[in-house]
Structure formats: C-alpha cells, structure tokens
Regions:
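Conserved beta-strand segments of alpha/beta enzyme cores
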Residues: 19, 68-70, 167-169
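A phosphate-binding catalytic loop at a beta-strand-loop-alpha-helix junction
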Residues: 1-12
Length: 194
C-alpha cells in the first residue's frame, strides 16, 4: 500500500510520497521489494494514490528490482481495507501479503512469515513484533516466526494487533558523518528526488 498522504512526514510528504523517501540511501519501497524478491515473490501489486506518478515512475514495471510490478489506484485515502479492495479489482487473488510500502523489515522476515503462513494451514495471519508497551486490552505476543493461530478474545484484540503491526521493523543505522556547517538535508540525503 503506497497511497497514503504521509501527514506526519510533512513537509517532505507534500512534495514526495513516503515510499520514495530514502532510508539508508535507498527509497524505502525499494527495500520492501528487495525483501519480497528474497522471500521468493515474483510479482507485487502496488496501490498508489497520493503523488502516485512518483511511485510508478520509480518502480516502473519492476524489472530493475527483479519483480513484476502492477498498479492499482486509490483515488482518495479511504484506508487499508479500501486499498486491498482496489488491488482485488485489478486481479490480485489470495493468498496475498498486505504491507505498507514504507515499512522496513529485517532481512528474511517477509520470507519467514510467508513460509510460516503456508505451513500453518490457516486462512489468514498477522505478523508483528510487540513493542513492550502494555496493550490497553488484550495483545498478541507471537514473534514473526511463531506458530500461527486464530485470535482469541473480543474483536478489538485485532485492532490492537493491527496497531502494533506497523511496528514490525527494526531499522539498522549505519555510519553517519559530522555536520559542521549549513546543509540542505533534502539535496544531501535524497539526491534522486527532484
């Protein structure tokens, strides 16, 4: 899903969509595609919306990333369920993995999750890493590679799990350099952005 407006990233996201902003020198969506390829995936459908043309121009047909990319448009930000519905409209069929395009995963996580899901025989699965904060009601505590099972408890347990699913990734930060003078952060860190 690459359709969101990225309101918390303003003012950067007013000019560039979050998935094309770099982390560790590459667009975050490129890191996601790399993980999908490493996990054995051969195609991906990217749901675009806000500044869609930039995402589509960056990814093209996906050949530069080793994965076939097709697109679905979400004309207005109507949430994740609508984004999945848009993907289904262009021919996506289960089983499928739904992920925000600006999520970083540790190496191998996507493939391990897909393998665990396939072996589970369950109709669906949700992966997340608990953040240590107490959940307001019930919370799941399985790691990404845990045995999958149905959610127990009231429906709002799913809401808590979905909230935490956005916190799946750990970011590894490499070497940084000292800054002793004025610096155009956009030009220095995002050279491929216009």
């Amino acid at each position: 899903m690459a359709a969101g407006e990225g309101r918390r990233m303003r003012p950067l996201s007013e000019r560039w969509p979050k998935p094309v902003l770099p982390i560790d020198g590459r667009p975050v969506i490129a890191s996601l595609l790399r993980e999908l390829v490493a996990g054995g995936f051969s195609e991906v459908t990217v749901v675009t919306g806000h500044l869609a043309e930039q995402v589509e121009e960056l990814l093209g047909d996906g050949s530069a990333f080793g994965i076939a990319v097709r697109y679905a448009r979400q004309p207005k930000p109507d949430g994740s369920a609508d984004a999945v519905a848009r993907a289904l409209e262009v021919g996506v069929r289960p089983p499928l993995i739904v992920s925000a395009a600006d999520t970083l995963y540790s190496a191998g996580d996507v493939g391990r999750f897909a393998d665990a899901f396939a072996a589970s025989g369950k109709p669906s699965a949700l992966a997340y890493v608990p953040d240590g904060r107490p959940a307001p009601l019930w919370g799941l505590t399985e790691a990404v590679t845990a045995v999958l099972h149905e959610l127990a408890g009231p429906p709002f347990e799913l809401l808590e799990a979905v909230r935490r699913a956005g916190e799946v990734a750990r970011v590894e930060i490499g070497k940084t350099r000292g800054v002793t003078g004025p610096l155009d952060l956009v030009r220095e860190n995002f050279p491929y952005l216009r």
